C-alpha cells in the first residue's frame, strides 16, 4: 500500500503531517463545541526525529485523506460533516444513558452496552461519501430506538405503581388523632375537678382565669352523666378545702366518745367516734364567708374533660360562678323540692312536706328575701368593769368586759325584723345530730368612729328559755313535749332577744367536726355596744309553705298550725342544692382518636403540624368549624387545620384583653392555666407515643395510616354504606363505630405491651449507663479540664491528618481564581531522561529565547 501511495500521491513528511493534524483538530473543535479531539503526536514533548518518521509511516493514509479533503471538499454551512455526525451520536448516547440510569438502573446498560451508540455504515469504504444526512437516517441509531422504548416502559411502570398506590390508599384505614368532637363520658370514668374563687385562699390552688372562654354550638350530644352525679364528692371536697386551714391550725379540744346501742355494747352495737373541735377563730377568719355562700365559686374540670351546658348549648372548662353554702340554712339559694315522697330514692333530695305534731307543711314555694334584720348588743354576764385608757381629749372611763373564759357567759343580742316571719321550727339542725332550732342571718357592721368594720354570722336559738324572754318560748301554746313549738313568729319592728349559738357539729366523711363559737364574741368585740344590719346575699330567699292541720286524733296535746303559712327552718340542703345547680352541666371529653377511611387523606390540607393548645380552644374549633348537625366529616377535615391556625391568635386576644383591664393577677393565672392545659394536651397526645411510632406516625401528625396487616388482623373493616363518602356527621360516625375505636385501642395496648424494640432500647440504655456511669463521680472542674485536653488533642490530630488535603484545596482554589489550568504530566523514569532532550512548549524549544529561535 505504501508503493501505491508513492506512485499516486506525494509523501507527507513530519512538518506537513503536524500541520494537517493541527487542521484536523481545529475542525473538530470548531464544530459545535469540543468532541475530545485528542493530542497532536508530533507536538508531544521530547519526541525524536525517528519517532516522527515512524508516526508518518503509520498515519500516512490518514494524512493523505486529510490532504485530499482540504483540496476537494468545500466546507459549507449546510454540510454537517462527519464530526458533527459523530458528535450527535455521542450526545444522544449520553442522553439515553442518563435516562437509563435515572429510570431503570445501570444493570441493563451493562448487559447491552455493545448495542448503544453504534453507527450503521462501513467506515472502510473508499468511495467519497455524501456528508448530508436526513432525519430518517439520524433516527435509525440504536440509542434513539432504545431511548423511546425506555421512555414508554418507564411511563407504564410509573402508571402501574400509581394505580397500586391508589388502590392501597383506598383500602387503608386512617386514625384521626384528637378530632374536633366531644362525646359524653362513661359512668365508670373518673373525673378530676377543682374549684376557682377569686381571693379565696382555700381555692387558689387552681387558677381558672379561662372560665369565660366559651363558644356557642348547636352540636347534639347524647345523654351522659352530669356533674350533679358527683355532688356528694364535690361537697365533701369543698368542705375539706374550706376547713383545711382551720384543721392545720390549733385544735380547741379533742375527745373520744362511745355511743351505745339499745342493748349496750352487745352484738357490736357500740360506735367509737373521734370528735375534733377546731379553733373557731380560724373558721371565722377563713371560712365564714364561704359557708355563707358569699364567695362565687366555679367548679372546673381537669384532665382534658369539659362541661357542656345543656341550657345555653355552650362548652367550657368551668361552671358559671355559683354560691355554694356548705351547711343547712333557713335562708339560702333556690332549691327545687319533690312532692311525691314515695318516689324519692335519694335521701339528699329535699322533701318539702313534713309533719310536726298535727301540723302538716306542704305546697312549699321559694320566695325571694326582702327582709332585713337589725341587731344590737348592750350587756352580757358574767364579767367585770375595767378602766379604759383615755386620751387628752377624753376623760377616764370604765367599760364592761365579759368573762370569755367562763362557761356561764351567754351572749344575747336584741334583733328586730322588717317583715313578719313565721318559722316552722323542728328539731333537725345542721348536718349531723345537733338539737335545737337555729335561725341564722349574716350581719355586717360598717366602720365608724368607735367601731371597726366587722362581719358576723348570727345564729339564734329561739326555743331556750323560761318564758321570761320575749321569744325564747317562741309560742303561746303550753305543754308541748318532744317537739319544738310551731308558733314561732317574729313580728316586724319588734325587738327580740337572740341567744347566740356557741357551736355546732358537722360530719364530713368519717370525721366529725365541732366548731366552737365562744371565741367569736371576743374576736369581733360583740360584748361592747354593737349594732348591724343584715347582709344576706341578694339572690337568697326562703321556703314558704302552707300549713294544714291533721285530722288524726292522738293522745296528748299536739301542736296545730298557728298560721296558714310558715317558713321551713334548716330547709336548704347543701348537697341537694349543689346537685341541682350542677345537673345542667354534662361532662364531655374529646376522643383520643377516631378511625376513619383513607378517603379523608385526599381532603387533608398540606399543613400537618399540630397545635399543642388544641384542648384549650376546642370550643373555638367547634364553633368556627361548624360541628353541628349540618357539618359532614369531610367538611370537618377540610376546615380543621384552618381552625387550628387561629388558636394562638385567640389566646393572644384574651391575654391582651386581660392586660387592658389591668388584671395582672388574672393575667398571671391565665398564663399558668394555659401552661397547665398545654401539659395536659401534651400528655394526652403522647399517651400512645410508642404505639404511634410503631404505626409510622409521629406526634406532629393528626392523620395516621394503620398498616393493612393490623386492621385485617383485628377485623377493622369500615362499613362504606354508613360512611357514605363522608356525608355523615362526626358525632354519628363516632356513635356507630365505637367497636372500631375499641379495636384500635386493643392494637395500641398490644403494641405497648409487646414493644420488643422498646425493651431493647431500655437494655441498651442500661448497658450504656453502666459503661459511662463512672463519669458522674468525677468532680465538675476535673470534667472541664479533661474535656479541654481531649478537645485540644483531637483538634490537633484532625489538623495533622487533614493538612495536605486542605493545602491542595486552597491551591486549586487559587488556580481557579487566577485562571490557571493544572495539567497532569506523565511520570518518566530517571534513567530515560537525557540532558540533550529538547522540550517543546507551544511550538518552541525549551531553553531558547524567542530571538535565538528566530
Swiss-Prot record:
Residues 805-854 are cytoplasmic. The record marks 609-610 as: Cleavage. GO terms for biological process: symbiont entry into host cell; virion attachment to host cell. Residues 660-678 are annotated as: Immunosuppression. The chain crosses the membrane at residues 784-804. Keywords: Cleavage on pair of basic residues, Coiled coil, Disulfide bond, Glycoprotein, Host cell membrane, Host membrane, Host-virus interaction, Membrane, Transmembrane, Transmembrane helix, Viral attachment to host cell, Viral envelope protein, Virion, Virus entry into host cell. GO terms for cellular component: host cell plasma membrane; membrane; viral envelope; virion membrane. The surface protein (SU) attaches the virus to the host cell by binding to its receptor. This interaction triggers the refolding of the transmembrane protein (TM) and is thought to activate its fusogenic potential by unmasking its fusion peptide. Fusion occurs at the host cell plasma membrane. This is Envelope glycoprotein gp150. It comes from Feline immunodeficiency virus (isolate Wo) (FIV).
Amino acid at each position: 500500500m505504501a508503493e501505491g501511495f508513492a506512485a499516486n500521491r506525494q509523501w507527507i513528511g513530519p512538518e506537513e503531517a503536524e500541520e494537517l493534524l493541527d487542521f484536523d483538530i481545529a475542525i473538530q473543535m470548531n464544530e459545535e463545541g469540543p468532541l475530545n479531539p485528542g493530542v497532536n503526536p508530533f507536538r508531544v514533548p521530547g519526541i525524536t526525529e525517528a519517532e516522527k518518521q515512524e508516526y508518518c509511516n503509520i498515519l500516512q493514509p490518514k494524512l493523505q485523506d486529510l490532504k485530499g479533503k482540504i483540496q476537494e471538499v468545500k466546507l459549507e454551512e449546510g454540510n454537517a460533516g462527519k464530526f458533527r455526525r459523530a458528535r450527535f451520536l455521542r450526545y444522544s448516547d449520553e442522553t439515553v444513558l442518563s435516562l437509563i440510569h435515572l429510570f431503570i438502573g445501570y444493570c441493563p446498560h451493562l448487559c447491552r452496552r455493545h448495542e448503544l451508540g453504534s453507527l450503521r455504515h462501513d467506515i472502510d469504504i473508499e468511495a467519497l461519501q455524501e456528508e448530508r444526512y436526513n432525519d430518517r437516517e439520524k433516527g435509525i441509531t440504536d440509542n434513539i430506538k432504545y431511548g423511546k422504548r425506555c421512555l414508554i416502559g418507564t411511563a407504564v411502570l410509573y402508571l402501574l405503581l400509581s394505580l397500586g398506590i391508589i388502590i392501597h390508599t383506598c383500602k387503608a384505614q386512617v386514625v384521626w388523632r384528637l378530632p374536633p368532637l366531644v362525646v359524653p363520658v362513661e359512668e365508670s370514668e373518673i373525673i378530676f375537678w377543682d374549684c376557682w374563687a377569686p381571693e379565696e385562699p382555700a381555692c387558689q390552688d387552681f387558677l381558672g382565669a379561662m372560665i369565660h372562654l366559651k363558644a356557642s354550638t348547636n352540636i347534639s350530644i347524647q345523654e351522659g352523666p352530669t356533674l350533679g352525679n358527683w355532688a356528694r364528692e364535690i361537697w365533701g371536697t369543698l368542705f375539706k378545702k374550706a376547713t383545711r386551714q382551720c384543721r392545720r391550725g390549733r385544735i380547741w379540744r379533742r375527745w373520744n366518745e362511745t355511743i351505745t346501742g339499745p342493748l349496750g355494747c352487745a352484738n357490736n352495737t357500740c360506735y367509737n367516734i373521734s370528735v375534733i373541735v377546731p379553733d373557731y377563730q380560724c373558721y371565722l377568719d377563713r371560712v365564714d364567708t364561704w359557708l355563707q355562700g358569699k364567695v362565687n365559686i366555679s367548679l372546673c374540670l381537669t384532665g382534658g374533660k369539659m362541661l357542656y351546658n345543656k341550657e345555653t348549648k355552650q362548652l367550657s372548662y368551668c361552671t358559671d360562678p355559683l354560691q355554694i353554702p356548705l351547711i343547712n340554712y333557713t335562708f339560702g339559694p333556690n332549691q327545687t323540692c319533690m312532692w311525691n315522697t314515695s318516689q324519692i330514692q335519694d335521701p339528699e333530695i329535699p322533701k318539702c312536706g313534713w309533719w310536726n305534731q298535727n301540723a302538716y307543711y306542704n305546697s312549699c314555694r321559694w320566695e325571694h328575701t326582702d327582709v332585713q334584720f337589725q341587731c344590737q348588743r348592750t350587756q352580757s354576764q358574767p364579767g367585770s368593769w375595767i378602766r379604759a385608757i383615755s386620751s387628752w381629749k377624753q376623760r377616764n372611763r370604765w367599760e364592761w368586759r365579759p368573762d370569755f373564759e367562763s362557761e356561764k357567759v351567754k351572749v344575747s343580742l336584741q334583733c328586730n325584723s322588717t317583715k313578719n316571719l313565721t318559722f316552722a321550727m323542728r328539731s333537725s339542725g345542721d348536718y349531723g345530730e345537733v338539737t335545737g332550732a337555729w335561725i341564722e342571718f349574716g350581719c355586717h357592721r360598717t366602720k365608724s368612729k368607735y367601731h371597726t368594720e366587722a362581719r358576723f354570722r348570727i345564729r339564734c336559738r329561739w326555743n331556750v328559755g323560761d318564758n321570761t324572754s320575749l321569744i325564747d318560748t317562741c309560742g303561746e301554746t303550753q305543754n308541748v313535749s318532744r317537739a319544738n313549738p310551731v308558733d314561732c313568729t317574729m313580728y316586724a319592728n319588734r325587738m327580740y332577744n337572740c341567744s347566740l349559738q356557741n357551736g355546732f357539729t358537722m360530719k364530713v366523711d368519717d370525721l366529725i367536726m365541732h366548731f366552737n363559737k365562744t371565741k367569736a364574741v371576743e374576736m369581733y368585740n360583740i360584748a361592747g355596744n354593737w349594732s348591724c344590719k343584715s347582709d344576706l346575699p341578694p339572690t337568697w330567699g326562703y321556703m314558704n309553705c302552707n300549713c294544714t292541720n291533721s285530722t288524726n286524733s292522738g293522745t296528748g296535746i299536739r301542736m296545730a298550725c298557728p298560721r296558714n303559712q310558715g317558713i321551713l327552718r334548716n330547709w336548704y340542703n347543701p348537697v341537694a342544692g349543689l346537685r341541682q345547680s350542677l345537673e345542667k352541666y354534662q361532662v364531655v371529653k374529646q376522643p383520643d382518636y377516631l378511625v376513619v377511611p383513607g378517603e379523608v387523606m385526599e381532603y387533608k390540607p398540606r399543613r400537618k403540624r399540630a397545635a399543642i393548645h388544641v384542648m384549650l380552644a376546642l370550643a373555638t374549633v367547634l364553633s368556627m368549624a361548624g360541628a353541628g348537625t349540618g357539618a359532614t366529616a369531610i367538611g370537618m377535615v377540610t376546615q380543621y387545620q384552618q381552625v387550628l391556625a387561629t388558636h394562638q391568635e385567640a389566646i393572644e386576644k384574651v391575654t391582651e384583653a386581660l392586660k387592658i383591664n389591668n388584671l395582672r393577677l388574672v393575667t398571671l393565672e391565665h398564663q399558668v392555666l394555659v401552661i397547665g392545659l398545654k401539659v395536659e394536651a401534651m400528655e394526652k397526645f403522647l399517651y400512645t407515643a410508642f404505639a404511634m411510632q410503631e404505626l409510622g406516625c409521629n406526634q406532629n401528625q393528626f392523620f395516621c395510616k394503620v398498616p393493612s396487616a393490623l386492621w385485617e388482623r383485628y377485623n377493622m373493616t369500615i362499613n362504606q354504606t354508613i360512611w357514605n363518602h363522608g356525608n355523615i356527621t362526626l358525632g354519628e360516625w363516632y356513635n356507630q363505630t365505637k367497636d372500631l375505636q375499641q379495636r384500635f385501642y386493643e392494637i395500641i395496648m398490644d403494641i405497648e405491651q409487646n414493644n420488643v424494640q422498646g425493651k431493647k432500647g431500655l437494655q441498651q440504655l442500661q448497658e450504656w449507663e453502666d459503661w459511662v456511669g463512672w463519669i458522674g463521680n468525677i468532680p465538675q472542674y476535673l470534667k472541664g479540664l479533661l474535656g479541654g485536653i481531649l478537645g485540644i488533642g483531637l483538634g490537633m490530630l484532625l489538623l495533622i491528618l487533614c493538612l495536605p488535603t486542605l493545602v491542595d484545596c486552597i491551591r486549586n482554589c487559587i488556580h481557579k481564581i487566577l485562571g490557571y489550568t493544572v495539567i497532569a504530566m506523565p511520570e518518566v523514569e530517571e534513567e530515560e531522561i537525557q540532558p540533550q532532550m529538547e522540550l517543546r512548549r507551544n511550538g518552541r524549544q525549551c531553553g531558547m529565547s524567542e530571538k535565538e529561535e528566530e
